[in-house]
């Protein structure tokens, strides 16, 4: 991974190394796998700058690791659930090394989640990997970045996520889901309230940019 002066990643020339921000074990906090023990592999670098991003520390730095070293660390930390999440940053900026690594994880019996914005093509993601695609809404500042051809790569086990900071984001997400018939394409469509950038402490309702009860009320009124 090459780093641009502003920290935005771009695809690197062929290399045997990846740029890794952190690898750790915790409980999954998002998607339909929330609450499950999980090993997180956070890759360094992102080509987007969402206004509410809470992982800006992954834009820069990190350490170089070979795919073999990453796999060994995952094996060492192995969660009892066998769940791994590949996240970032934007993991697909390191597609060349990441794709075979994910395939190896799947072949070794792991359940692998790939969290991605869908800004980069996803056609090379191994079919056994569960894509959790975070389609950016307008208030993120990156609302036109989703690679629309990625809709054709979606599988029934995949999930689509929208981070909502206000009514306009909700309407965008609703219309996108209906227009592209997402309910028939994926396992789950997730609406998540955005949190204030730099908010300290726990992720609770007081830090939300939109009240979760308000979001729920609008959602139920539409259905």
Predicted stretch roles:
Residues 2, 14-25, 37-38, 44, ...:
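Conserved Radical SAM active-site core
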Residues 21-24, 42, 161, 190-192:
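Residues in well-ordered beta-strands of folded domains
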Residues 29-33, 45, 221:
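Short secondary-structure boundary/capping segments within folded domains
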Residues 31-34, 51-54, 202:
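Short, glycine/acidic-enriched capping/hinge loops at junctions between secondary-structure elements
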Residues 93-223:
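Conserved AdoMet/S-adenosylmethionine-binding subsite of the radical SAM
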Residues 28, 32, 58-59, 152:
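N-terminal/domain-start segments enriched in small and hydrophobic, helix-friendly residues
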């Amino acid at each position: 991974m090459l780093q641009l002066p502003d920290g935005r990643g771009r695809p690197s020339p062929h290399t045997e190394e990846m740029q890794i921000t952190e690898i750790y074990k915790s409980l999954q906090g998002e998607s339909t796998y929330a609450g499950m023990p999980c090993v997180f592999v956070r890759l360094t670098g992102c080509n987007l700058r969402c206004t509410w991003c809470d992982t800006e520390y992954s834009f820069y730095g990190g350490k170089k690791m070979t795919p073999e070293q990453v796999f060994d660390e995952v094996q060492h930390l192995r969660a009892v659930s066998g769940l791994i999440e590949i996240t970032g940053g934007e993991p697909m900026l390191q597609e060349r090394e990441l794709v075979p690594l994910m395939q190896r994880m799947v072949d070794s019996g792991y359940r692998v989640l790939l969290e991605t914005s869908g800004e980069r093509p996803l056609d090379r993601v191994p079919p056994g990997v569960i894509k959790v695609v975070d389609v950016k809404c307008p208030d993120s500042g990156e609302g036109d970045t989703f690679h629309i051809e990625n809709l054709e790569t979606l599988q029934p086990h995949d999930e689509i996520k929208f981070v909502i900071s206000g009514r306009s984001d909700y309407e965008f997400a609703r219309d996108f889901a209906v227009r592209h018939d997402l309910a028939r394409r994926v396992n789950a469509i997730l609406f998540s309230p955005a949190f204030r950038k730099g908010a300290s402490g726990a992720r609770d309702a007081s830090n939300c940019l939109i009240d979760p009860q308000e979001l729920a009320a609008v959602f139920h009124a539409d259905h």
